[in-house]
Amino acid sequence: MKASMFLALAGLVLLFVVCYASESEEKEFPRELISKIFAVDDFKGEERECKGFGKSCVPGKNECCSGYACNSRDKWCKVLLGK
């Protein structure tokens, strides 16, 4: 009887600890999200890598990687053939 009471009490304490931990993580989530948004803004000024096969592009801007060309009709990088 004593063992089952102790086990039930330990289970309730464990449940309380898990709920408290998950609730504190939820409170920090908006702060983490905002910091990640501002971290993404820091990278906007940097030069981006070239775009590979199937990535959207703007014709004439030379955004595609070497061996690919921006198709003016489909507006995505395709394999450059013949040139």
UniProtKB/Swiss-Prot annotation:
Positions of disulphide bridges: 50-65, 57-70, 64-77
Organism: Cyriopagopus hainanus (Chinese bird spider)
Function: Weakly blocks the rat SCN2A/SCN1B (Nav1.2/beta-1) sodium channel (IC(50)=68 uM) and the insect sodium channel para/tipE (IC(50)=4.3 uM), without altering the activation or inactivation kinetics (depressant toxin).
PROSITE patterns in the cross-refs: HWTX_1
Phylogenetic placement of the source organism: Eukaryota, Metazoa, Ecdysozoa, Arthropoda, Chelicerata
Name of the protein described by the UniProt record: Mu-theraphotoxin-Hhn2b 1
Keywords: Amidation, Disulfide bond, Ion channel impairing toxin, Knottin, Neurotoxin, Secreted, Signal, Toxin, Voltage-gated sodium channel impairing toxin
Similarity remark: Belongs to the neurotoxin 10 (Hwtx-1) family. 14 (Hntx-1) subfamily.
Further facts: Negative results: has no effect on mammalian SCN3A/SCN1B (Nav1.3/beta-1), SCN4A (Nav1.4), SCN5A/SCN1B (Nav1.5/beta-1), and SCN9A/SCN1B (Nav1.7/beta-1). Has also no effect on sodium subtypes in rat DRG neurons containing Nav1.1/SCN1A, Nav1.6/SCN8A, Nav1.7/SCN9A, Nav1.8/SCN10A and Nav1.9/SCN11A.
